[in-house]
Amino acid sequence: MTWLLAGFAAAAVAGCSGGATGASTAASSGQSFVTGSYSTTVFRPGSRLAAPPVTGTTLAGRQLRLRSYRGDLVVLNFWGSWCGPCRQEAPALAALDRRLQSDRVRFIGVDSHDQQAAALAFERTFEVGYPSLSDPGGVVALQFYGTVPPASIPFTLVIDRSGRIAGRVIGIASYSGLKKLISDVQPRTS
């Protein structure tokens, strides 16, 4: 199993360091971040894949299971305190989290390749009120290999109320763009 994860990691790093969105490398982490443009995708209900069984420990030391959010729409954002584009999108994510809580939209962060003190400082600086999983080795991101480039952040996934991957943003998620994506993946009621 270890060699399989190592193989996925090598493929992810080799295949995701450039592309249409561009990438830059943070020297302190060896991790890439997306620069330039972004792309948004909405997956049709019939083609949505089940989200992997993500579990882990939050920066606050609590256990979190993605499965326990079934019935809610989940916005899963992958970030790092060292990532300039992540810092740029953080205020929009925090504001949307506050605005959409009553609509059963839950935000979860996944902090990539960070020291805990730096990650907690990021959350304080940007007033992030939602939980973030600590993912220092990139294991959570690798679970989404094939859906997103796990070696380049930021990226954001929208998980529908049935636990399926309904949409994604690769690159900086803007307030208006992410709000529209969330609206587009929710079931129509009328």
Where are these regions (language model features)?
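Short, conserved catalytic or interaction motifs in soluble domains
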Residues: 18, 88, 161
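N-terminal targeting signals for export/organelle localization
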Residues: 1-55, 190
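Short active-site neighborhood of thiol/selenol oxidoreductases, capturing the structured segment around
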Residues: 64-87, 93, 107
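Structural microenvironment flanking redox-active thiols in thiol-disulfide oxidoreductases
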Residues: 87-126, 136-143
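N-terminal post-signal-peptidase region of extra-cytosolic proteins
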Residues: 39-40, 59, 64, 142-144
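A short beta-strand-turn-helix
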Residues: 45-48, 53-74
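Thiol/disulfide oxidoreductase modules built on the thioredoxin-like
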Residues: 121-129, 136-190
